[in-house]
A protein has these predicted regions:
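Blade-level signature of beta-propeller repeat domains, shared across WD40, Kelch, NHL, RCC1
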Residues: 159, 164-194
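Beta-strand initiation motifs
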Residues: 79-83, 140-144, 184-189
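WD40 beta-propeller repeat blades
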Residues: 1-81, 85-96, 179
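Conserved blade-ending motifs and adjacent loop-strand segments that build the rim/top face
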Residues: 26, 83-105, 142-162, 194-204
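Conserved strand-to-loop turn within each blade of WD40 beta-propeller repeats
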Residues: 51-52, 68, 128-130, 169-172
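Loop/turn segments within WD40 beta-propeller blades
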Residues: 30-32, 39-43, 99-104, 116-121, ...
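Hydrophobic beta-strand positions that form the internal "hydrophobic ladder"
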Residues: 47, 125, 166-167
Length: 219
């Protein structure tokens, strides 16, 4: 039999570290809605996904299957293997995400304001949950508007009408129309960027087509 040498005897025992893992999304039992509407950003750089859940993996007790928070995950187009960021703090799970199709000028930022993305323009999107709608902009990490108590059932879909009006529909059979204006002169989401101001040729061509839509004819 081979006798262990002194080096092997003095070598400390190595503990096997278990890599904690968890799911990213709710299953069909927990997500009791007809839809999971994810969407790409207007510039095509990232994808936002609803029905997401986040686990705090600091301890095994916290990482239990029933102990999670509702969130929305963002995936960058060049790396879809894992989320690049998340938007936590949702009271209930997200069912639908809808981007405003236009790009906007960035407002003057406060010194302590941390952007969600450092972009030369501002993008606006709405997140619908079972009982709320949260409107975000990419130049800040907190919502610019939170709307609640407007439906008796989960919100199934949303759409932007022009650049200031958001329409949401619910399983209760009703639609809600929300305007993003404080008064006649103040717009919550900012001023639209003119197509000719965009440096990216693909984006400029896309927004030139959007700019030709006459929304007054639809009223």
């Amino acid at each position: 039999m081979k006798e262990p040498n002194s080096a092997e005897q003095s070598k400390p025992e190595q503990k096997t570290q278990r890599v904690a893992s968890h799911r990213l999304f709710l299953d069909d039992i927990e997500h009791q809605s007809f839809v999971r509407r994810l969407q790409w950003s207007p510039d095509g750089n990232f994808l936002l996904t609803p029905s997401a859940c986040y686990y705090d993996l600091q301890s095994e007790e916290q990482a239990s299957r029933s102990n999670y928070s509702y969130t929305v995950y963002g995936f960058l187009k060049h790396n879809m293997s894992q989320p690049a960021f998340m938007l936590p703090g949702l009271k209930t799970y997200a069912t639908c995400i809808k981007f405003n199709p236009f790009l906007f000028e960035k407002p003057w930022a406060k010194p302590d304001q941390v952007p969600l993305f450092d972009l030369p323009y501002r993008m606006v999107f709405a997140i619908a949950t079972t009982d709320q709608i949260l409107v975000y902009a990419t130049d800040q990490q907190t919502p610019i508007a939170v709307i609640g108590n407007i439906h008796y059932a989960p919100i199934n879909d949303m759409t932007w009408y022009s650049n200031e009006v958001l329409v949401a529909c619910s399983s209760d059979g009703y639609c809600s129309i929300m305007t993003m204006t404080k008064d006649d002169e103040t717009n919550l989401i900012g001023k639209r960027i003119a197509p000719e101001a965009l440096e990216d040729e693909t984006l400029r061509s896309h927004y030139e087509q959007l700019d030709k839509v006459d929304y007054d004819k639809l009223e």
